[in-house]
Regions:
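Short, conserved active-site loops that position catalytic residues or coordinate cofactors/metal ions
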Residues: 41-57, 248-250, 280-294, 430-432
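Membrane-embedded alpha-helical bundles of multi-pass enzymes
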Residues: 2-232, 437-438, 449-453, 464-466, ...
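Glycine-rich, flexible loop/turn motifs
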Residues: 148-161, 170-172, 253, 347, ...
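Generic structural signal for well-ordered alpha-helices
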Residues: 111, 115, 270-273, 388, ...
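Short glycine/proline-enriched turns and hinge-like loops at secondary-structure junctions
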Residues: 151-154, 238, 328-332
């Protein structure tokens, strides 16, 4: 009896230690996943972390951990990573920041759940079937990024491809596949490297192992998506486009809509703008909703903007509010971009934002949630636009079709693509990131503009109220960024950028612009095919052991 009790106690102690080891491993995987996420995306300076971001979770999945343990710790890691990445959102809403982090963490968690199911089963598959299954996992990642873009109005912030925003050599595939292709290459490399490491461990332990075709296929994809396509960026024939003046007034959000501060705000805009007159800008650009009163619908505000354009002796492209009434007398508010010319004044053609921010610019189902009105800074809902609203900007040697995107519209590739299809030669992003403090938000936001430039082979010019202001060429190269003497983007000032373009893309459309999100459909087919191949075969736990012999 005593011996039995001692054995039982020993077993309990061993089980307890084993449990602690599993918990420690799970916590380590969660922490490492969060660290790699934060390092990979701006303002992190280690985009190469995206090549190994999923590997801790993938290697863990090969050990067949308990489902609850696996999903629980990976959710913790993904959630923590997102909290750090969108920490800036707490300036607007703590609840929204925490809730959004949890929601967006669910999408990669679904992918890791699929990997937990697939990874132990890959060993029992023939080479062709195994490669197809791995391609299916990579395709599933793309499908989940697409779903995150569309569900519940969408929050496509920081897809995996955005990690490479300062690595133009890998971005060129976006002109063919959209940013989806970049995400596919990166996650497939994670899968290939993870499987290679598994084989390597098997070789070290048993001095034998098999060829890992998935890893070498990942290298092929990486080469084709980078060096193989980078040649498209060589042999450029660049020509001057314009001298773009950029005004960054850096109006604090707490006073932006305060009527008592209106005169001070206008004086700041005027001084910051006219300080650039000696640099002879061809066109001046102001950020989103820059004026404290509506530009359209307020005669005095319109007159003031027209006066500034005449004093500057140059056209001004500015973000502002448009106010009007419909036939029934109901108020209509638009978040818009206008063109003001020194000779003719405010152009009747303007762009209105098409994708509004829920609970920021309108309240979904307002009649069911009237209490939510306190979260909207302007009393009523904004009305979305429904066209690209191209602005015809007269330059000394040509008339330029300018396509506008407001605030976070540049995170939606379909909007930039539609604007380019309608004839835009230059994409302009007017934004106001002052809502989110001086953290990572502006850098992360700019990363999406880089993707839009490459996808559509159009230069992108950005002006922010407080940063990030600059321009990106058709190949994703960041050509200029407005910074102060301390190299900070967060300041009040302005500059004039010499914009140019590659003549080879004048009037031409990229493959992606012409054909859209075809790669998402391909990824869906791969994901379904891979799932069918895995589900059809029962799991053999001894297959992995046999595969290394």
């Amino acid at each position: 009896m005593a011996a039995s009790a001692r054995v039982s106690g020993h077993d309990r102690g061993r089980d307890s230690r084993s449990r602690l080891i599993r918990l420690g491993l799970g916590a380590s995987i969660a922490g490492l996943t969060a660290v790699l996420m934060v390092a990979a995306f701006p303002p992190g300076r280690f985009p190469e972390a995206a090549y190994i971001l999923a590997i801790p979770g993938l290697l863990w999945s090969r050990r067949r951990p308990e489902w609850r343990l696996f999903l629980g710790f990976l959710f913790l890691g993904l959630f923590t990573g997102w909290v750090v990445l969108i920490w800036w959102l707490h300036h607007v809403t703590w609840v929204g920041m925490i809730g959004m982090s949890g929601v967006v963490a669910l999408f990669p968690l679904v992918w890791f759940a699929a990997a937990r199911f697939a990874m132990p089963r890959l060993a029992e598959l023939e080479v062709a079937t195994r490669i197809t299954a791995v391609l299916g996992l990579a395709g599933l990642w793309v499908v989940l990024e697409w779903a995150r873009m569309h569900l519940f109005s969408g929050f496509p912030w920081l897809p995996l491809a955005a990690s490479q925003w300062e690595r133009p050599i890998l971005l060129q595939s976006a002109a063919f596949t959209g940013f989806w292709g970049i995400s596919f290459i990166l996650i497939f490399f994670n899968l290939g490297l993870a499987l290679y490491l598994v084989r390597l461990v098997g070789f070290v332990r048993r001095r034998n192992g098999r060829f890992c075709p998935e890893f070498y296929l990942a290298l092929v994809f990486l080469f084709l998506g980078s060096f193989g396509l980078y040649r498209t960026a060589t042999g450029q024939k660049r020509e001057p486009l314009m001298r773009a003046g950029v005004t960054q007034p850096y109006i604090p959000q707490v006073i932006k809509w305060d009527p008592s501060e209106a005169r001070s705000i206008l004086d700041t805009i005027y001084r910051t703008t006219l300080n650039l007159k000696a640099l002879e800008p061809t066109v001046m650009f102001w950020p989103e909703a820059v004026t404290p009163l509506a530009v359209l619908g307020n005669a005095s505000m319109q007159g003031w903007v027209e006066t500034v354009s005449r004093d500057l002796d140059a056209p001004i492209v500015l973000g502002g509010i448009a106010f009007s009434e419909d036939d029934g007398g109901a108020e209509l508010w638009h978040n818009s971009v206008f063109l003001v010319k020194p000779d003719t004044g405010l152009s009747p053609v303007f762009y209105s934002k098409r994708h509004l921010v829920p609970f920021g610019e309108y309240i979904p189902l307002r009649r069911f949630f009237p209490w939510a009105a306190k979260f909207v800074p302007i009393g009523g809902d904004f009305t979305p636009g429904d066209t690209s609203g191209l602005l015809s900007v007269n330059l000394p040697e040509r008339t330029l079709s300018l396509g506008s995107l407001i605030c976070y519209e540049d995170v939606y590739p379909a909007l930039a693509r539609r604007t380019t299809l309608d004839g835009a030669a230059l994409l302009y992003v007017a934004t106001n990131n002052a809502w989110y403090g001086e953290g990572a938000a502006a850098y992360q936001h700019a990363a999406h503009s880089v993707l839009r430039a490459v996808e559509n082979r159009r230069p992108v010019l950005r002006t922010g109220n407080g940063g990030w202001s600059g321009w990106i060429d058709e190949y994703g190269l960041i050509r200029n960024v407005l910074v102060n003497d301390e190299e900070s983007i967060y300041f009040r000032g302005g500059s004039v950028f010499e914009l140019d373009r590659d003549r080879r893309w004048i009037g031409r459309l990229s493959f992606y612009t012409r054909h859209g999100d075809w790669f998402v459909l391909l990824s869906f087919v791969l994901a379904v095919t891979g799932a069918v191949l895995l589900v059809r075969r029962p799991y053999d736990p001894l297959a992995e052991v046999r595969s290394t012999k």
